[in-house]
């Protein structure tokens, strides 16, 4: 089921998400819906708060990018960053901020402890695009958006676009949720 994406100015995007204690059918259904919604919106990552669910769950699928065509989708539950290495800047966008792009400096390599789609504990080292997308999505679980990590002078350049989003003046090729509207997908 394709879920609407919550956009900038929705409280759920600024809240710290709660850890999951386990996986049940509702969570498995939510994961499937998140993957479907992300792909429908031509995204490569989606965190549960972006579909109105304040839980520590995210999905990533880089296979739409030629370089990562053989990669399988990744489900990450209750992530905890253990170590970071190196830094680089790269332009980022976000399904919750349609049409807005900005340069963000992030660690280029990370070590992450998390639970997978079977709730098995894992520790992995990630670099490049996967490290960047993981950090971007983990930020959503912590109530942060990529625009919070932009340099102030660059952030000021997009104030007009952010204001337009905040008042609901937005267009996207995928369903968007109105601020403050609870998602049925979260009723677990």
Curated annotation (Swiss-Prot):
Write one Pfam family the protein is assigned to: Pep_deformylase
Cofactor requirement: Fe(2+)
Query: A Gene Ontology molecular-function term?
Result: peptide deformylase activity
InterPro entries, per the entry: Peptide_deformylase, Peptide_deformylase_sf
GO terms under biological process: co-translational protein modification; translation
User: How many cofactors are bound and how?
Assistant: Binds 1 Fe(2+) ion.
Q: Which enzyme type, at the first EC level?
A: hydrolase
NAD as a keyword?
no
EC assignment: the record states 3.5.1.88
List of residues binding Fe cation: 94, 136, 140
Which PANTHER family would you find in this protein's record?
A: PEPTIDE DEFORMYLASE
Function statement: Removes the formyl group from the N-terminal Met of newly synthesized proteins. Requires at least a dipeptide for an efficient rate of reaction. N-terminal L-methionine is a prerequisite for activity but the enzyme has broad specificity at other positions.
What's this protein's name? Peptide deformylase
């Amino acid at each position: 089921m394709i879920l609407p994406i919550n956009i900038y100015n929705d409280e759920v995007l600024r809240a710290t998400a709660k850890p999951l204690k386990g996986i049940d059918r509702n969570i498995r259904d939510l994961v499937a819906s998140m993957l479907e919604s992300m792909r429908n919106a031509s995204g490569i990552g989606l965190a549960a708060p972006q579909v109105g669910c304040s839980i520590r769950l995210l999905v990533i699928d880089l296979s739409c990018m030629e370089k990562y065509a053989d990669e399988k989708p990744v489900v990450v539950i209750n992530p905890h960053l253990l170590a970071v290495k190196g830094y680089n800047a790269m332009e980022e966008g976000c399904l919750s901020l349609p049409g807005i792009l900005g340069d963000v400096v992030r660690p280029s390599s990370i070590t992450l402890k998390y639970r997978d789609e079977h709730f098995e504990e894992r520790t992995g080292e990630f670099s490049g695009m996967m490290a960047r997308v993981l950090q971007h999505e983990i930020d959503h679980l912590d109530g942060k958006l990529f625009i919070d990590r932009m340099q102030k002078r660059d952030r000021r350049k997009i104030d007009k676009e952010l204001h337009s989003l905040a008042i609901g003046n937005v267009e996207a090729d995928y369903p968007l949720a109105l601020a403050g509207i609870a998602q049925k997908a979260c009723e677990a």
